[in-house]
Design a protein with these regions (language model features):
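Short, small-residue alpha-helix embedded
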Residues: 106-109, 183-199
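Glycine-rich phosphate/pyrophosphate-binding beta-alpha loops
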Residues: 179-181
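Glycine-rich phosphate/dinucleotide-binding loop and adjoining beta-alpha-beta core of small-molecule
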Residues: 2-176
């Protein structure tokens, strides 16, 4: 495990996990966003973390052919919580986003607005968390379509939408989960577990 983040958190990580490596270096996967404040929350640590995450996520942005090759060569990354609003417009499938309904609504609103502007289309009705809860599969599929990312939508039924090795859409649904997964912080644990599996 390698940790890169604020010094006060580094000390807590080392106290709990002395074998953790602190600082930059080689990784097999990234997990970003857990514990990172959203853009609307100000603070020096949060700003520094967000700047670092934004710089990392730029490497995953799809664009020109050279940029695409570089993006596909990057290790898998899990983008959670406070980093979801930093997601580039188009990313490859090894980018996994893990929003809950409220975060998904914000993400869909951002990307639908960008798509409407690019296509000179009429603007869409804003999504709400309730819209996502009422149509979770359609929401997850739309997020995948707009971003290219593999989408893991957290909820009563966890929905994963991505593509298989041949580029075909793949959907996995799981309604089996322990009750503790509905408590605050369990999404951070999920992101960490997913990052470990992707490594």
């Amino acid at each position: 495990v390698r940790y890169l983040g604020p010094e006060r958190a580094q000390n807590m990580v080392l106290a709990a996990l002395p074998e953790a490596v602190i600082g930059k270096g080689h990784v097999q996967s990234w997990v970003v966003g857990s514990g990172v404040p959203e853009a609307s929350v100000e603070g020096t640590d949060g700003d520094m973390q967000r700047d670092t995450i934004a710089a990392l996520l730029k490497h995953y942005a799809l664009g020109s052919e050279d940029e695409n090759k570089d993006a596909y060569d990057m290790p898998p990354i899990v983008v959670d919580a406070g980093a979801l609003d930093l997601l580039p417009e188009r990313v490859p499938g090894q980018v996994v986003i893990t929003p809950h309904a409220g975060e998904m609504a914000k993400l869909l609103n951002r990307f639908e607005t960008a798509a409407s502007t690019a296509e000179h289309a009429d603007s869409h009705e804003p999504y709400t968390a309730d819209d996502v809860r009422l149509n979770p599969l359609a929401s997850a599929k739309r997020a995948h379509e707009l971003t290219g990312a593999t989408v893991l939508l957290k909820g009563a039924v966890t929905m994963v939408v991505g593509t298989d090795g041949e580029g075909n859409e793949r959907v996995i649904l799981s309604g089996r989960a322990p009750a503790w997964m509905s408590t605050a912080g369990s999404g951070d644990v999920l992101a960490g577990m997913l990052g470990a599996l992707l490594a």
